[in-house]
């Protein structure tokens, strides 16, 4: 039986997939038994898989068929140390970015979808997309010593501002 935390995380991944399915009108689904099948030490498995199979094991969400370059990792936690973002180092976020980028390929749009109890839903994307993606008026920029600079904004606001741009860039 899965732990309460794992069940909570799986629910968030399903929520993200359902939201994107509704937004784009194509199926987005949670990766079954999501984990690092092709990430980290398992990256060698990519050499034996088709592009469609690789897409099915990247991140936590299998994107719709017209989004081959979209890589989404989902995290749902009780709390998050937001103060560490402005203090310059957030080990928790760096760990999640490690997980996200481990299975990423060059040219992917890498998105970290986060949800925290009583705080809301957030999304992080790499700053080099800022010319293409909009961040709106309220956002946080976080510089990771390992993964460069990321923009963190409200989850729903990101998709409202950038749904067309994501589709164009993820093909």
Which ranges hold each PLM region?
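Acidic-basic catalytic patches of nuclease active cores, encompassing PD-(D/E)XK
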Residues: 1-48
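Basic, flexible Lys/Arg- and Gly-enriched helix-loop patches that mediate nucleic-acid binding at interfaces
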Residues: 87-101
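Phosphate/NTP-binding elements of NTP-utilizing enzymes
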Residues: 55, 76, 96-99
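Intrinsically disordered, low-complexity terminal regions enriched in charged/polar residues
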Residues: 128-171
């Amino acid at each position: 039986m899965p732990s309460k935390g794992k069940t909570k995380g799986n629910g968030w991944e399903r929520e993200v997939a359902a939201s994107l399915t509704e937004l784009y009108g194509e199926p987005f689904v949670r990766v079954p038994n999501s984990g690092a099948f092709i990430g980290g030490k398992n990256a060698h498995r990519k050499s034996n898989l088709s592009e469609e199979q690789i897409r099915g094991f990247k991140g936590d969400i299998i994107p719709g068929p017209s989004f081959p370059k979209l890589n989404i990792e989902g995290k749902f936690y009780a709390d998050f140390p937001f103060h560490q973002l402005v203090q310059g180092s957030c080990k928790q976020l760096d760990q999640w970015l490690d997980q996200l980028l481990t299975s990423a390929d060059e040219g992917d749009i890498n998105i970290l979808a986060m949800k925290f109890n009583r705080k809301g839903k957030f999304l992080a994307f790499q700053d080099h997309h800022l010319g293409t993606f909009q961040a709106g008026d309220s956002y946080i920029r976080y510089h990771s010593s390992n993964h460069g600079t990321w923009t963190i904004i409200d989850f729903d606001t990101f998709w409202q501002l950038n749904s067309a741009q994501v589709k164009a860039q993820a093909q």
